[in-house]
Amino acid sequence: MKSLVNLWGIYPFIRNNSLHGFAKIPRIVSTIPRQLRFSSLRHPTRQMDLIHDTVVVENLNTFAVVGQDQWKRKEPQPVQIDVYMRNNVQLAGEKDELKSTIHYGIASKLLRKEIEGSFFTTPKDLVNKIASLCFEDVIDTSHVSIKLTLPKCVLRSKNGLHYYAERERNSTSNFVDRIEFSDLELATILGIHAFERQEKQRVCLNISFANTEVEALEIARAIAEYVEQSAFLTIEALVVNLSKYLCFTKNLDDISIKAEKPSAITFANASAVQIYRTRSYFLQESLHKYESTKNKIAYLSFGSNIGDKFEQIQTALSMLHKIEGIRVLDVSPLYETEPMYYKDQPSFLNGVCKIETRMSPINLLRACQSIEQEMGRIKTILKGPRCIDLDIVLYEDCVYESEVLTIPHLGLQEREFVLRPLLALSPDLVHPYTHQPLQEALDKLPSQGIRLYSSFDNKKIINGALTMGILNVTPDSFSDGGKVSQNNILEKAKSMVGDGASILDIGGQSTKPGADPVSVEEELRRVIPMISLLRSSGITVPISIDTYYSKVAKLAIEAGANIINDVTGGMGDEKMLPLAASLQVPICIMHMRGTPETMKALSIYEKDIVEEVAVELSSRVEAAVQSGVHRYNIILDPGFGFAKTPKQSAGLLGRLHELMKKPQFKDMHWLSGPSRKGFTGYFTGDASPKDRIWGTSACVTASVLQGVSIVRVHDTKEMSKVVGMANAIRYVP
């Protein structure tokens, strides 16, 4: 393949600021074979037999439709043509006559006649037309070099688009054409000084690259958008990152960029940086950079649509934990998604995990493939059904391509089922070579109908809030103490389930303000027999154990409970969060300060209550994640009535959606527990907890309309009806 990669210096029509600086060399030099070009200049008499003469037509002006003009219209636009036609002028020079050479006047007329007013799809089509005319008998050259200029083609360019090409008659040589944008004038934030960060300044760009399948004007627009949205400190960073961005987003093999900063030096025209980069350079650089044994951060996507999808994912994550050189740092919520490419297959369960690893990208790929193979994945249909799928989505800021691996993942920016879980883990992630925030990419996608998955409702998809019925087996509960015992709990549980409870919450210790704690042994005596009785009697709905003792939680799960509901968010027992992680069960983490004995005195919020609750609850989520709890197993509770005055609880409920939309809580499930709380009676005038059903109804409605997944209530029959109506208001089209 003959390439124009080193275009600067090959042709006489290259700009004066060319890399090799030979713009003023006599034109006859331009077509000397490349390997002899410089020696021929030093010793012209030794290589005269190798010199190829040219006849030149410069700046031939005409007009034609060449693709789109600067306003994206298919309208005629000015065209300037430079043609360098190879021809031995020796005989014409000796005889001083025209018949032995190319008649440039005839050539000019022929070119104008055939081109003027014609329609060409691309600049390359026009170049091919010019070459074919030059090879005809009228002109009869065997080799032609062409510079095509469209001065009005690029909206932000002072001198438009230049297209450089070389053609040979009857040749199978695959010449690589080049495109240049000349004097692109853009504005961006650029500089290290404070005053340079306050206002955009002009930059002037000259960019050339090998012709590509991507439309040139699309590339020009991408350049303008990238540069004007950037805010680099140095011009070096601008050109390096721009070249990387274009190589990968526009599939360019190579690129040359010169960037001038006219306002940089008071007594000079401009400061400038000029670079040449290739796609392969970036790939090799990235690969070398990440071959070290230092720990790196990577993100893996996972999915399953065969068998018990949830269990398949749990198994794959457990296997990932056990691989030496990999540490799982965080796991996203889970999402059910319809198949995107091959449609005739079951829906998928998808998510993303964040890992720390010393492995290179290739070795990490092999580790993922080993898990797939061990779990029995068999690839039969491209993008078809699979028991497990593990892909490297991101690996630090690595850009890598090979026959077996591409990083970032090729489908990253078009897949909601990858972007959403990815951003749930790291909301501020940017694309490695576009530097576009991934949140912007997600915002641009049309909804792909993915649904948040629930690990606490018998592993179903939630289509609205669920009702959690409260079964307190405590003698001193603030609302219903002493009303549930082993004699009536089964009847009570069946009644709640029949009335609409999707989850039962069993508690053996009062957490009302001022309540004294009971011992672990006493709480175990109260709750374990109850859970065992319910399970042995055929109660199948999920059971939540309301406790902050890890031992109680462990034995309750072994007895048949499914969920841990810890009002202290793991602060009451340091073993609670690691226990939830090891058991791989959902845990509800509530916002609370102090203990039930002390929390009333801790209701002072110096700043905005939503912001303070967000910070404190976020710290508990982080503690859970660091303990190994996966985000899909975390349920959050704002803690109405706990270390909050009635007005604070009501205000927090009214702004619950603000708390839920914080980036650190993206797509997490929420529980609301306002039932019969003091603040509901404070505003309705109901002193007795059993009379607070109307205030509770209003709070439940407000909670559901703001998107909570669970409401925890005493009056199951009435509140299930309220939840049903609120779900209809929020979710029914």
UniProtKB/Swiss-Prot annotation:
Keywords: ATP-binding, Cytoplasm, Folate biosynthesis, Kinase, Lyase, Magnesium, Metal-binding, Multifunctional enzyme, Nucleotide-binding, Phosphoprotein, Transferase. Residues 295-454 are annotated as: HPK. Its EC number is 4.1.2.25, 2.7.6.3, 2.5.1.15. Pathway: Cofactor biosynthesis; tetrahydrofolate biosynthesis; 2-amino-4-hydroxy-6-hydroxymethyl-7,8-dihydropteridine diphosphate from 7,8-dihydroneopterin triphosphate: step 3/4; Cofactor biosynthesis; tetrahydrofolate biosynthesis; 2-amino-4-hydroxy-6-hydroxymethyl-7,8-dihydropteridine diphosphate from 7,8-dihydroneopterin triphosphate: step 4/4; Cofactor biosynthesis; tetrahydrofolate biosynthesis; 7,8-dihydrofolate from 2-amino-4-hydroxy-6-hydroxymethyl-7,8-dihydropteridine diphosphate and 4-aminobenzoate: step 1/2. Residues 55-167 are annotated as: DHNA 1. It is found in: Cytoplasm. One of its GO terms (molecular function) is metal ion binding. Its cofactor is Mg(2+). Residues 467-733 are annotated as: DHPS. Its main location: cytoplasm. GO terms for cellular component: cytoplasm; cytosol; mitochondrial envelope. Residues 465-724 form the Pterin-binding domain. This is Folic acid synthesis protein fol1. It comes from Schizosaccharomyces pombe (strain 972 / ATCC 24843). The gene is fol1.
